C-alpha cells in the first residue's frame, strides 16, 4: 500500500489535509472529510495515534512524583513524531513512523 501511495501525484488540497493530520485534535478533520484518499487516510491514522498519545500524557500528570517526568518525555515524543509526520507530508512521502505506524495499522 505504501508504494502505491508514494507513486501518486498530490494536489494542494491533499497536502493540506495530510498536514492537518499531525496538528493535534485537527487530525479528525482529514479522518472525517477525506477518508477516500489513501495518502490522507494514512497520515490521519498516524496523526490520530500521536494525538491519543498526547491525551494519555496529560493523564500522567495525575501520577505522583513520576507524572511530570512521564508527561515531559511523552510531550517531547509527541512533538518529534508530529514534526516527522509534517516533514513526510511536505516531501510527499508516506513514512511509517516507528511504533506509531504499528498502532495506526491496527486501527
UniProtKB/Swiss-Prot annotation:
Phenotypic consequence of gene deletion: Single non-polar gene mutation and deletion of the probable mms6 operon (amb0955, mms6 and mmsF) leads to weak magnetic response and much smaller, elongated magnetite crystals. Vesicles that are probably empty precursor magnetosomes are present and can grow to wild-type size.
Sequence ranges on the Lumenal membrane side: 35-46, 91-107
Regulation: Its function may be negatively regulated by one of the MamGFDC proteins.
Keywords: Biomineralization, Magnetosome, Membrane, Transmembrane, Transmembrane helix
Membrane topology annotation: Multi-pass membrane protein
Compartments it resides in: Magnetosome membrane
GO cellular component: magnetosome membrane
Superkingdom: Bacteria
Cytoplasmic side: 1-13, 68-69
Industrial and biotechnological uses noted in the record: May be useful for the manufacture of precision magnetite nanoparticles of uniform mineral type, and consistent morphology, with high magnetization. Addition to an Fe(2+) and Fe(3+) sulfate solution increases the quality of the magnetite crystals.
Principal location: membrane
Further details from the record: This bacteria makes up to 20 cubo-octahedral magnetosomes of about 45 nm in diameter which contain membrane-bound crystals of magnetite (Fe(3)O(4)).
Family (UniProt): Belongs to the magnetosome MamF/MmsF protein family.
Biological role stated in the UniProt entry: Plays a major role in synthesis of cubooctahedral magnetite crystals by controlling crystal growth and morphology after nucleation. Has a partially redundant function with MamF. When overexpressed in E.coli the soluble protein self assembles into shells of about 36 nm. This protein mediates the formation of magnetite nanoparticles from a solution of Fe(2+) and Fe(3+) sulfate; the crystals are larger and lack alternative iron oxide/oxyhydroxide species seen in the protein's absence.
Subunit-level organization: May oligomerize.
Protein name: Magnetosome protein MmsF
Species lineage: Bacteria, Pseudomonadati, Pseudomonadota, Alphaproteobacteria, Rhodospirillales
Amino acid at each position: 500500500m505504501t508504494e502505491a501511495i508514494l507513486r501518486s501525484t498530490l494536489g494542494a488540497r491533499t497536502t493540506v489535509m495530510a498536514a492537518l493530520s499531525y496538528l493535534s485534535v485537527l487530525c479528525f478533520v482529514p479522518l472525517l472529510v477525506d477518508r477516500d484518499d489513501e495518502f490522507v487516510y494514512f497520515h490521519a491514522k498516524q496523526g490520530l495515534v500521536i494525538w491519543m498519545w498526547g491525551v494519555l500524557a496529560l493523564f500522567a500528570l495525575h501520577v505522583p512524583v513520576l507524572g511530570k517526568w512521564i508527561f515531559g518525555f511523552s510531550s517531547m515524543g509527541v512533538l518529534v513524531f508530529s514534526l516527522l509526520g509534517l516533514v513526510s507530508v511536505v516531501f510527499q512521502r508516506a513514512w511509517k513512523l516507528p511504533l506509531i505506524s504499528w498502532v495506526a495499522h491496527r486501527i
